[in-house]
Amino acid sequence: MEIWKVIFSIWFLLFQNFVLSAKNDDNKLKVIRGRNVIYNGNVIPLSILIRNGKTIGIKDYSFNPKKLNENYEILYDDRECNNNEDFIIMGGLVDSHVHVNEPGRTEWEGFESATSAAAAGGVTTIVDMPLNSSPVTTSFKNLLDKIESMKGKLRVDVGLLGGIVPGNSKEIKKMVLQGGVLGFKSFLLPSGIDEFPPVNENDIQEAMNEMKLLKCQYNNSDVIMMFHAEVEEPIKEATVRLKNENADPKLYKTYLDSRPKISENQAISKLIDITRQNQIVSTHIVHLSSSESIEQIREAMDQGVPISAETTYNYLHLTSESVPYGNTLFKSAPPVREHENKELLWNAIINGTIKLIVSDHSPCTINLKQLKEDNQSIGDFLKAWGGISSLELGLPIIWTECKNRGIPITQLSEWLSNGPSKLVGLNDRKGSIEIGRDADFVIFNPNESFIVNEKKLFLKNKFSAYNGEKLFGVVYETILRGNSIFKKGDNKIKKIIGQRLIKSNLINKK
């Protein structure tokens, strides 16, 4: 019976994608024209031709579509708009680290609100983590539950990760070949979700052995293994010491001291050793926070170890010194660290050690932050849920930092779009403006600033560590596969045309 559910699930996905394309009249030629298009590492004037949701032509800015002698639609033309000479057109953002929390914890977030927030932020693709939903995505059966929960809710395209926990390595093959997951994630310490326990070295080896078999037997592309890289012992020792010292749990420094860099450093060292021995399965460090780990990652990469790392919007913008007393909206794991640490992370981004920037969007309810909705309550950092909501704000957060540092705007495309799409194997269709790729774009004004108003965000729980902050880079329009899904001023994302993304070459059709 289960195999028929598998066949039906894959058939439904393909049929749904076909119907969505037909419904949106994608066969009609569409044109985007702009003076400032990020293309091949440059900002140049271009005309972009779109059909069936794909970019089919890249022409000079002066190109006249009337010469093609067919009906066409102008999606965007900066010559027909006022005061937009500075607007940038870029490939839609890809956020490969998002916690959507559906099914089971939709009071935290959900596919409707998360994908709406993504669209409003210029993000056209997100990848959902496997642990904060209930059930967690650690089996093929649970994966089908998540797929079912997505139907009729997606405003942007969504890929899924599976989870690796002790004893579930035999689920890997089915989740990849029949479920189409883009990769897997594990924790080296308790995740905070009882159903998603940490793995040890034997568990990792078992999982890697399964992935080796997949790669060798089916001649398939690499399936990434992602790790939350902290070990527990240094954290437990630091927490006991701080409690014995009666350290104030409402002071952010107390939480920061409870999560020392050595916890990350030791975990990453262990993962480098395992990956070096394995050499076939690629591993990826999610949300790198400790600057002390940068050098060992760089050395391993230079030695040919298949390992990579990401960092987050939060670690590149926020600092521990600026966290207000008791404001647990700033709590994440690993933690936001000192200004000096932030600068070293930026150095690693600029020199290419860290190749992508993501949100690690991890929302929850206000009570789990040990706060109330009066905006005046004081929270306990040691008890509050760790996670910062930033999915909608990534483009302006990182552009504000780049603008202040004199970093070219073209780097946004590499760090926020192309890098994440490569990580999860979607760069054949996502991540940049190229002929044959999905016609996903964000149009924004890099010179316009705004003040973050948390109540106007599309998130389900409308509170933010960025509330009241001035950021540069206002998103004016988001386009998904040639369809405009968001325009500045929209208070609801009405088009539900998002699709589940799979590695089509990994689906076993035999």
UniProtKB/Swiss-Prot annotation:
Enzymatic class: hydrolase
Kindly provide the PTM information from the record. Answer: Carboxylation allows a single lysine to coordinate two zinc ions.
Question: What EC number(s) does the entry state?
Answer: 3.5.2.5
Q: In which pathway does it act?
A: Nitrogen metabolism; (S)-allantoin degradation; allantoate from (S)-allantoin: step 1/1
GO BP term, pick one? allantoin catabolic process
The UniProt record gives the binding positions of Zn(2+) 2 as 185, 228, 287
Where, in this chain's numbering, is Zn(2+) 1 bound?
97, 99, 185, 360
Cofactor names from the entry are:
Zn(2+)
Q: Which GO terms describe its molecular function?
A: allantoinase activity; cobalt ion binding; zinc ion binding
What does the record say about how the cofactor binds? Binds 2 Zn(2+) ions per subunit.
Any single GO CC term annotated in Swiss-Prot or TrEMBL for this entry: cytoplasm
Which segments cross the bilayer?
none
Keywords, A to Z? Hydrolase, Metal-binding, Purine metabolism, Zinc
Pfam families per record: Amidohydro_1 (PF01979)
Catalyses: (S)-allantoin + H2O = allantoate + H(+)
> Residue positions of the PTM N6-carboxylysine?
185
Q: Which residues form a coiled coil?
A: none
Subunit structure and binding partners = Homotetramer.
Q: Which family, according to the similarity comment?
A: Belongs to the metallo-dependent hydrolases superfamily. Allantoinase family.
Q: Specify the protein name.
A: Probable allantoinase 2
Query: Which source organism does the UniProt entry give?
Result: Dictyostelium discoideum (Social amoeba)
